[in-house]
């Protein structure tokens, strides 16, 4: 377990603090190579030829392990969180640290597997001898990281790379329940898993959906994943939750920028090994993360003579309620379309801007606002209020969708789910909020037609 209050202030988007999971990273860097042996070398059954330029292995030749009860797939894009970026490896090692946490947990049942794909970092700490020039595939067994295979490097920001890992992982380690974790930076609708070896190429929500759909189709899979998690900043967004609901039962993510150390892996892995329910494991992730950052009652903290808000958040959702929520939101948005005009859109943007926002001073570049706080303010606004029938329906659906949410006192009105709105035209809506990225079509119409443009709201 990580000890002490972590450095949890973060600048998302254009400026990145090493040790923070928000933003795009520091840009590309050249890769170095490290030895390929791990703590416990394993034998690959994948039939990988090592010659495919996409990095994909020959998944048709995988020899599956015996079907287990649970497999957790971790897509670990190390980036500068691992390499330290411009500051060097001594300021990185955060991916390695989380692997170390997992391998120290005792009592792993034989039918529970944690499977990791590594990449995305120009350098890895030497603890596990993870190569930066290959994509590595590992599993945890007997308190050791065991190598399954290394394959030709490909950007972790490609849908094809994610899809290949999903196909390989679900084929090699079949289970009654399968979970998927994205480990890296997150930047809201602008995506996650920024590969510093490939000019910060990253996964948009549309690309994640393409990868999931492709993997499910290739495998003929009809059972949903048990849960999808984002150990990344700023990813608990209603559009992402709704699209993920086609592929998973639950989702866990943060509305705010996460502290650099991210989740407390040993705490929740211990509960996983103990056979706790999905709901208990997800709750343990939330509680462990918040506790590691000083607890829910913390309002602020001091660091190097400066005072910062303690604003960490984490929540998990019941995705079976996501469609109901989207319908309620879209009905509300449809009413709003007749209330917002070119003459009052400045007032409209002021209303949206008054809602709780995330990513600190750079919030306009990310465009993430608390959904419930916005609806509460909308309901109190005489100009734009669509009527209590619509706002109450959204609030009721929100309560059903957000099953567990903890926010530190310094986070303010963070109720567990965010919306996207391009308040100043800086959040990249033309690239990250397309018809392929969201099914909230009425809300997208409002964002596209009444959101701000570069330089202001007019």
Per-region residue spans from a language model:
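Loop/turn elements at helix/coil->beta-strand transitions in domains of secreted/extracellular proteins
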Residues: 68-71, 109-114, 173-179, 221-227, ...
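C-terminal motif of bacterial Sec signal peptides marking the signal peptidase cleavage site
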Residues: 16-19
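Bacterial signal peptide processing site
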Residues: 21-24
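N-terminal extension/subdomain marker
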Residues: 27-174
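Short acidic, glycine-rich surface-loop motifs adjacent to enzyme active sites
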Residues: 176-191
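Terminal, contiguous helix-loop blocks that mediate binding/assembly
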Residues: 44-60, 167, 171, 188-189, ...
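Positively charged n-region of N-terminal signal peptides that target proteins for export
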Residues: 1-4
């Amino acid at each position: 377990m990580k000890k002490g209050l972590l450095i949890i202030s973060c600048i998302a988007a254009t400026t990145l603090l090493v040790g923070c999971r928000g933003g795009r990273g520091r840009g590309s860097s050249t890769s170095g190579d490290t030895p390929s042996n791990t703590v416990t070398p394993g034998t690959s059954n994948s039939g990988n030829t090592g010659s495919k330029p996409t990095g994909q292995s020959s998944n048709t030749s995988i020899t599956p392990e015996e079907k287990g009860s649970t497999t957790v797939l971790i897509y670990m894009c190390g980036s500068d969180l691992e390499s330290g970026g411009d500051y060097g490896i001594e300021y990185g090692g955060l991916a390695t640290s989380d692997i170390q946490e997992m391998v120290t947990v005792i009592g792993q049942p034989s039918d529970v597997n944690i499977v990791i794909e590594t990449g995305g970092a120009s350098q890895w700490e030497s603890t596990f001898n993870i190569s930066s020039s290959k994509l590595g595939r590992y599993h945890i067994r007997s308190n050791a990281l065991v190598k399954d295979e290394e394959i030709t490097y490909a950007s972790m920001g490609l849908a094809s790379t994610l899809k290949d890992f999903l196909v390989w992982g679900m084929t090699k380690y079949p289970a009654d329940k399968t979970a998927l974790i994205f480990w890296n930076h997150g930047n809201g609708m602008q995506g996650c898993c920024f590969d510093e070896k490939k000019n910060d190429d990253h996964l948009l929500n549309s690309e994640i959906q393409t990868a999931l759909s492709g993997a499910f189709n290739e495998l003929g899979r009809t059972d949903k994943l048990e849960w999808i998690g984002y150990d990344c900043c700023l990813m608990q967004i209603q559009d992402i939750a709704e699209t993920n609901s086609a592929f998973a039962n639950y989702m866990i993510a943060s509305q705010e920028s996460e502290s650099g150390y991210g989740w407390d892996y040993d705490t929740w892995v211990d509960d996983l090994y103990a056979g706790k329910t999905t709901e208990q494991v997800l709750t343990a992730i939330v509680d462990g993360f918040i506790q590691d950052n000083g607890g829910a009652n913390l309002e602020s903290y001091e660091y190097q003579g400066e005072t910062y808000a303690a604003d960490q958040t984490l929540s998990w959702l019941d995705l079976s309620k996501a469609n109901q929520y989207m319908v309620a939101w879209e009905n509300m948005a449809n009413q709003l379309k007749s209330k917002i005009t070119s003459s009052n859109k400045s007032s409209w943007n002021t209303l949206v801007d008054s809602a709780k926002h995330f990513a600190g001073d750079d919030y306009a570049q990310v465009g993430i606002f608390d959904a419930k706080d916005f609806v509460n303010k909308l309901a109190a606004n005489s100009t734009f209020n669509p009527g209590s029938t619509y706002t109450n329906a959204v609030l009721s659906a929100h309560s059903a969708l957000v099953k567990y949410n903890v926010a530190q006192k310094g986070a303010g009105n963070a109720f567990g789910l965010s919306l996207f709105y391009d308040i100043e035209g800086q959040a990249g809506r033309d690239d990250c909020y397309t018809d392929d990225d969201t099914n909230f079509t009425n809300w997208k119409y409002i964002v596209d037609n009444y959101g701000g443009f570069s330089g202001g709201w007019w």
